[in-house]
């Protein structure tokens, strides 16, 4: 039976870099953020999101993800309602995706909010990617071109690393990407041999 390995970490921790590296090792990786963005292009989903937030969130009949982020990260109730539209669809898509890899020993599900969404319960093992808070803030400001305040707002909606560590099987500290990738290789080797 294929093991589902959860890969998570706070915004700016470098989990996407680690996910790419794991994929280069021949392990299929499901990136929940990418699939969630695809789901946001489905007409029925667009209609539900517009019903929730109004037509101001549209840009040429597509959902403006920056406008959504600005709304949901300021209001926990809006975030909860938004997630209730998106998460069940991502969950179903993942269930179908993983079926094509039933002959493999493991697959990885990369999700920023693996714990917060409760989907960690569906994973056999969990890898947490961490980095110092200040490093994470600087990475996201540079990557997304957003203010420090915007990054801190997003962080406020994620569990802190200590809480995540308590539920994780492996922790990769991503201060030095080369060392973090080596840690990922070692963890994948262990998981393949379990």
Q: Model-derived features: where do they sit?
A:
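Short gly/ser/thr-rich secondary-structure transition/capping motifs
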Residues: 88-92, 107-112, 152-157
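ATP-dependent small-molecule kinase phosphotransfer cores
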Residues: 34, 38-105
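Small-molecule kinase domains that catalyze NTP-dependent phosphoryl transfer to phosphate-bearing small molecules
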Residues: 121-122, 133, 142, 146-190
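A general structural signal for well-ordered alpha-helical segments in protein cores
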Residues: 4, 19, 32, 42, ...
